[in-house]
Amino acid sequence: METSAPRAGSQVVATTARHSAAYRADPLRVSSRDKLTEMAASSQGNFEGNFESLDLAEFAKKQPWWRKLFGQESGPSAEKYSVATQLFIGGVTGWCTGFIFQKVGKLAATAVGGGFFLLQLANHTGYIKVDWQRVEKDMKKAKEQLKIRKSNQIPTEVRSKAEEVVSFVKKNVLVTGGFFGGFLLGMAS
């Protein structure tokens, strides 16, 4: 069944052809418009081979963690703010992190210290008997395993993450400095 309405692509080609006829005085414009007209006409329904595929999962795996968090280029995006703004952003985030770290640290220290206190109390009253010879034997075994595993070579995963962190710190010195200053203030408050 044929309809009398023309296809949308043919309307674009006809409109482009009319506009290119109006600009016959400028040969550069005519040639570029003609090329666009030809490209539009030739690509109607033919999209094979014209596109390049990009595997986003592989692309995301290759990106450093701060680019995933802050965007493609964290350096220039941070540099677009003034020095005071960068220091303020770093200081506020550092203070919040330090404050939370302090509160969680106090809670963890209280739990560990309280648990140690209760264990000592239970040991002193006789509820728990510690086999100190076995503890000493296990400690020696653990020391030997650490000596065996100890090497001067850092694993590549750790080295690559450390290089990423150093690169981020170098690109964002003001934000990083503000963060550490704010972190220390947050720990103190």
Swiss-Prot record:
<keyword id="KW-0597">Phosphoprotein</keyword>
<dbReference type="GO" id="GO:0005739">
    <property type="term" value="C:mitochondrion"/>
</dbReference>
<dbReference type="GO" id="GO:0000422">
    <property type="term" value="P:autophagy of mitochondrion"/>
</dbReference>
<comment type="function">
    <text>Binds directly and specifically 1,2-Diacyl-sn-glycero-3-phospho-(1'-myo-inositol-3',4',5'-bisphosphate) (PIP3) leading to the recruitment of PIP3 to mitochondria and may play a role in the regulation of the platelet activation via AKT/GSK3B/cGMP signaling pathways. May act as transcription factor that regulates SREBP1 (isoform SREBP-1C) expression in order to modulate triglyceride (TG) homeostasis in hepatocytes.</text>
</comment>
<keyword id="KW-1000">Mitochondrion outer membrane</keyword>
<feature type="modified residue" description="Phosphoserine">
    <location>
        <position position="53"/>
    </location>
</feature>
<dbReference type="Pfam" id="PF04930">
    <property type="entry name" value="FUN14"/>
</dbReference>
<protein>
    <recommendedName>
        <fullName>FUN14 domain-containing protein 2</fullName>
    </recommendedName>
</protein>
<keyword id="KW-0472">Membrane</keyword>
<keyword id="KW-0539">Nucleus</keyword>
<dbReference type="GO" id="GO:0035356">
    <property type="term" value="P:intracellular triglyceride homeostasis"/>
</dbReference>
<keyword id="KW-1133">Transmembrane helix</keyword>
<keyword id="KW-0496">Mitochondrion</keyword>
<feature type="topological domain" description="Cytoplasmic">
    <location>
        <begin position="1"/>
        <end position="80"/>
    </location>
</feature>
<comment type="similarity">
    <text>Belongs to the FUN14 family.</text>
</comment>
<dbReference type="GO" id="GO:0005741">
    <property type="term" value="C:mitochondrial outer membrane"/>
</dbReference>
<keyword id="KW-0805">Transcription regulation</keyword>
<feature type="transmembrane region" description="Helical">
    <location>
        <begin position="81"/>
        <end position="101"/>
    </location>
</feature>
<feature type="topological domain" description="Mitochondrial intermembrane">
    <location>
        <begin position="102"/>
        <end position="107"/>
    </location>
</feature>
<dbReference type="GO" id="GO:0010543">
    <property type="term" value="P:regulation of platelet activation"/>
</dbReference>
<feature type="topological domain" description="Mitochondrial intermembrane">
    <location>
        <begin position="186"/>
        <end position="189"/>
    </location>
</feature>
<keyword id="KW-0812">Transmembrane</keyword>
<dbReference type="GO" id="GO:0005547">
    <property type="term" value="F:phosphatidylinositol-3,4,5-trisphosphate binding"/>
</dbReference>
<feature type="topological domain" description="Cytoplasmic">
    <location>
        <begin position="129"/>
        <end position="164"/>
    </location>
</feature>
<feature type="modified residue" description="Phosphoserine">
    <location>
        <position position="151"/>
    </location>
</feature>
<keyword id="KW-0804">Transcription</keyword>
<dbReference type="InterPro" id="IPR007014">
    <property type="entry name" value="FUN14"/>
</dbReference>
<feature type="transmembrane region" description="Helical">
    <location>
        <begin position="165"/>
        <end position="185"/>
    </location>
</feature>
<dbReference type="GO" id="GO:0005634">
    <property type="term" value="C:nucleus"/>
</dbReference>
<feature type="modified residue" description="Phosphoserine">
    <location>
        <position position="10"/>
    </location>
</feature>
<feature type="transmembrane region" description="Helical">
    <location>
        <begin position="108"/>
        <end position="128"/>
    </location>
</feature>
